[in-house]
From Swiss-Prot:
Protein name as it appears in the record: Imidazoleglycerol-phosphate dehydratase 2, chloroplastic
Signal peptide residue numbers: none
PANTHER family associated with the record: IMIDAZOLEGLYCEROL-PHOSPHATE DEHYDRATASE (PTHR23133:SF2), IMIDAZOLEGLYCEROL-PHOSPHATE DEHYDRATASE HIS7 (PTHR23133)
Catalytic activity: D-erythro-1-(imidazol-4-yl)glycerol 3-phosphate = 3-(imidazol-4-yl)-2-oxopropyl phosphate + H2O
GO biological process, any: L-histidine biosynthetic process
Species for this entry: Triticum aestivum (Wheat)
Cofactor (UniProt): Mn(2+)
Residues in coiled coil: none
Recorded metabolic or biological pathway in which this protein acts: Amino-acid biosynthesis; L-histidine biosynthesis; L-histidine from 5-phospho-alpha-D-ribose 1-diphosphate: step 6/9
Cross-referenced CDD domains: IGPD
Residues given in the record as Mn(2+) 2 binding sites: H135, E139, H207, H232
Length: 269
């Protein structure tokens, strides 16, 4: 678990020396949260999506992207339903700082892995009907994270697009292959031997990734190579996913800002 202080300067302070394309956070969305930028070459110009919030029943839809010289790729989504209230912020160009409070302790632990091993800054605050079970919160958190990823990626110019990583954890080993293609698909080959890890229903692992895939538009293959400890299998999965996603979202300098597709476009449509 990351132990560094989780400090978020305001957006105006973070970009005081330059004009920012980001509006102030909407009223009622909580305190403004910004992530420290990780610098790139001066010739690299990104398109950053404007942070968006959703109403009841939505998954979070990013507004049209605007030209920006801001290095960090940020996504923010607020998803509110009768079952859950979820607020997600993600910085693809972060330093691995996590601040998660989902009401599901084991999921908080897994989101720490996503941040730490992906070097993403991840902020997730959620409340929900966990007195029934964790299903709704688990699903809606994943839907919001997927939408925030989609938003932060923008038009995906210059990224590697593909990621592949195998992570071991003691006797467990899990392989993850992904493509930020805009085409949602999940193949999940996990064999988790117990029904629960702590209070967490292990059936929710596959459902988490299916929900994330649906809104992010990625193709994701998960294959368990070894393992007989449920905690180790799930944690190895999140670690491998984090490293594969980091690889896919990082920049290929040889592309010089071009879209990594022979079609010339990567989108959900």
């Amino acid at each position: 678990m990351t132990t560094a202080p989780f400090l978020f300067p305001s957006l105006s302070r973070l970009h005081s020396a330059r004009a920012s394309s980001f509006p102030k956070p909407p009223v009622g969305s909580g305190a403004g949260v910004a992530f420290p930028a990780r610098p790139y070459g001066s010739s690299l110009r990104l398109r950053s999506s404007v942070m968006a919030a959703t109403g009841v029943g939505g998954n979070g839809s990013p507004m049209a992207p605007e030209e920006s010289t801001v290095s960090s790729r940020l996504g923010e989504v607020k998803r509110v339903t009768k079952e859950t209230n979820v607020h997600v912020k993600i910085n693809l160009d972060g330093t691995g700082v996590a601040n998660s409070s989902t009401g599901i302790p084991f999921l908080d632990h897994m989101l720490d892995q996503l941040a730490s091993h992906g070097l993403f800054d991840v902020y997730v605050k959620a409340t929900g009907d966990t007195h029934i079970d964790d299903h709704h919160s688990n699903e809606d958190i994943a839907l919001a994270i997927g939408t925030a990823l989609l938003q932060a990626l923008g038009d995906r110019k210059g990224i590697n697009r593909f990621g592949h990583f195998t992570a071991p954890l003691d006797e467990a080993a899990v392989e993850v292959i992904l493509d930020l293609s805009g085409r949602p698909h999940l193949s999940c080959g996990l064999s988790i031997p117990t029904e629960r890890v702590g209070t967490y229903d292990t059936q929710l692992v596959e459902h988490f990734f299916q929900s994330l895939v649906n809104t992010s538009g990625m193709t994701l293959h998960i294959r368990q190579l070894a393992g007989n400890n449920s905690h180790h299998i799930i944690e190895a999965t999140f670690k491998a996913f984090a490293r594969a996603l980091r690889q896919a979202t990082e920049y290929d300098l040889r592309r010089q800002g071009t879209i990594p597709s022979s079609k010339g476009v990567l989108s959900r449509s």
